[in-house]
Amino acid sequence: MRILKSHPLLKIVNSYIIDSPQPANLSYLWNFGSLLALCLGIQIVTGVTLAMHYTPSVSEAFNSVEHIMRDVNNGWLVRYLHSNTASAFFFLVYLHIGRGLYYGSYKTPRTLTWAIGTVILIVMMATAFLGYVLPYGQMSLWGATVITNLMSAIPWIGQDIVEFIWGGFSVNNATLNRFFALHFLLPFVLAALALMHLIAMHDTVGSGNPLGISANYDRLPFAPYFIFKDLITIFIFFIVLSIFVFFMPNALGDSENYVMANPMQTPPAIVPEWYLLPFYAILRSIPNKLLGVIAMFAAILALMVMPITDLSKLRGVQFRPLSKVVFYIFVANFLILMQIGAKHVETPFIEFGQISTIIYFAYFFVIVPVVSLIENTLVELGTKKNF
């Protein structure tokens, strides 16, 4: 017997990435898992390297980043890889979630996998926010001040929580130290969650497929077929990432963060990184501070209710015309929210933001269940007519 199948550790690896039987009809939309694992690997390696040269201090943080850029061998490359792979990570995660919503990956028996995936998204957002504060430019300082201040919306204990997070009465050395410690820790938590995500998927029925039906009658081993298929998208990913890192490394960043943090001067507009903009737009679209914070967190957790609100008898929207139209409206609405999150709080962006927020929540709690019931009824009527 081969050592791969007899060794206690290697046989686990073998069962997951070598002999694992995958549906033969998987499209390239099922390649995001390997790309996201690659992104996480790049982030951990570049992050640990950056941590060796970074100083989490109000007076030295900005200078230590400049030191990495100017004095450390290939420090500029490590930093730009880290910042641009973060954007790639979120871009691929949103595509991964979109594919899951389109093909009904949240339905039984993959509900646990979907729930763990939602937790991964929340941890990713927390990690990204903590990391954005560390260079300690203008946007870092004011972004940290604005986002941590959201906790003050909690009745009675809000302000105490904010000061507990800061470790003082404003963003200071203690804040940077704890943000750095947590930013260093959370990627390893992410890796553990990703492993749980994989185990939850493999220990139920494995990957879904574009048809949304059982693929037990036609499967192929993961190696060499799907490893080669994954390698194709990995090479494309490296080409695109290299274009950003070498030719436009700051295209997805904010120029304000190249100005050293100054608590006495507020930047013209305080906006987070592009991948957090839709949720920032939802936060700003509700005038009440507490309700805005609740809505922002609810917007992420809304993904958790999809297994409950989708009442369709079919998995996915690929064979459901009404749901397909509604899904594409939801995607367009999400992109509109992303644009509005970057705009100033003024007319007409306030009104557009409020309309888009209503559409966003309506999709999960109203539109999906209503449309799926209509489609179920039409299918049943059609079936009775044929028989």
Curated annotation (Swiss-Prot):
SUPFAM superfamilies: a domain/subunit of cytochrome bc1 complex (Ubiquinol-cytochrome c reductase), Transmembrane di-heme cytochromes
GO cellular component, one term: mitochondrial inner membrane
Record-annotated membrane-spanning stretches: 32-52, 76-98, 113-133, 179-199, 226-246, 290-310, 322-342, 349-369
GO terms (BP aspect): mitochondrial electron transport, ubiquinol to cytochrome c
Sorted UniProt keywords: Electron transport, Heme, Iron, Membrane, Metal-binding, Mitochondrion, Mitochondrion inner membrane, Respiratory chain, Transmembrane, Transmembrane helix, Transport, Ubiquinone
Family annotation (Gene3D superfamilies): Cytochrome Bc1 Complex, Chain C
Cofactor binding, note field: Binds 2 heme b groups non-covalently.
Record-level Gene Ontology MF annotations: metal ion binding; ubiquinol-cytochrome-c reductase activity
Family in the record: Belongs to the cytochrome b family.
Protein name: Cytochrome b
Organism: Emericella nidulans (Aspergillus nidulans)
Name of the encoding gene: cob
